[in-house]
């Protein structure tokens, strides 16, 4: 009967987020060997089950904050969702391969980060979305933009070339690469790249 009463959804989402962070820290500390060199992590199974049960609320919380244009909070939720997939607590679940929603959530994490110009977070989360049919090209666009903003020209150019190879119909990569070549009078490199593309 108590479930029929209204409740504060943001509090529920924040509780799920805080629980995940708390259990991550508990697990990290439980993995430290004792004085005999043994690791006794007796709460890992129950904590990981609780995190997996709360994980959908991370998506909901991220979406709610994203829609409120609170990108910092949205990133926190989306990033934690992705971080669960790469946390050692969940090795057996193989979430990077089995979670079909993860690439989209990684995309939203990188989008929220990009809106704040948090380029380290863009570079951490966007790669998980690169292969997605719907959002992969945009994730690669975020990566390129972040690399350029950080002043890493070599990696930026490489990311543009990767983007052209993977998503040739998406004009962002080609346009920026041609702009780079023409603005820096690198016409020979531009011709060589065009020849390589045609080969």
Place the predicted regions along the sequence by residue.
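Short coil/linker segments at helix-helix boundaries
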Residues: 1-106, 120
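Conserved small-residue packing positions in alpha-helical repeats and bundles
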Residues: 1-4, 62, 110, 143-145, ...
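Canonical positions in the second alpha-helix
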Residues: 26, 81, 128-129, 162-163, ...
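Short coil turns that delineate tetratricopeptide repeat
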Residues: 31, 86, 133-135, 168-169, ...
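Residue at a conserved register position within TPR or TPR-like alpha-solenoid repeats
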Residues: 65, 106, 113, 146-147, ...
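Canonical tetratricopeptide repeat
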Residues: 94-95, 101, 108-111, 138, ...
């Amino acid at each position: 009967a108590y479930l029929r009463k209204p409740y504060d959804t943001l509090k529920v989402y924040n509780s799920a987020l805080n629980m995940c962070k708390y259990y991550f820290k508990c697990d990290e500390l439980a993995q430290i060997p004792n004085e005999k060199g043994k690791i006794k992590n007796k709460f890992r199974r129950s904590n990981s089950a609780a995190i997996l049960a709360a994980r959908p609320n991370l998506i909901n919380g991220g979406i709610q904050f994203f829609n409120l244009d609170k990108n910092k909070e949205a990133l926190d939720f989306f990033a934690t969702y992705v971080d669960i997939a790469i946390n050692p607590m969940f090795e057996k679940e193989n979430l990077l391969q089995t979670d079909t929603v993860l690439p989209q959530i990684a995309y939203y994490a990188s989008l929220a980060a990009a809106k704040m110009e948090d380029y380290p977070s863009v570079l951490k989360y966007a790669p998980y979305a690169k292969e997605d049919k719907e959002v992969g090209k945009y994730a690669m666009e975020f990566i390129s933009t972040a690399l350029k903003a950080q002043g890493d020209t070599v990696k930026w150019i490489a990311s543009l070339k990767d983007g052209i190879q993977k998503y040739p119909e998406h004009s962002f990569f080609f346009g920026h690469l041609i702009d780079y070549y023409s603005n820096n009078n690198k016409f020979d490199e531009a011709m060589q790249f065009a020849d390589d593309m045609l080969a």
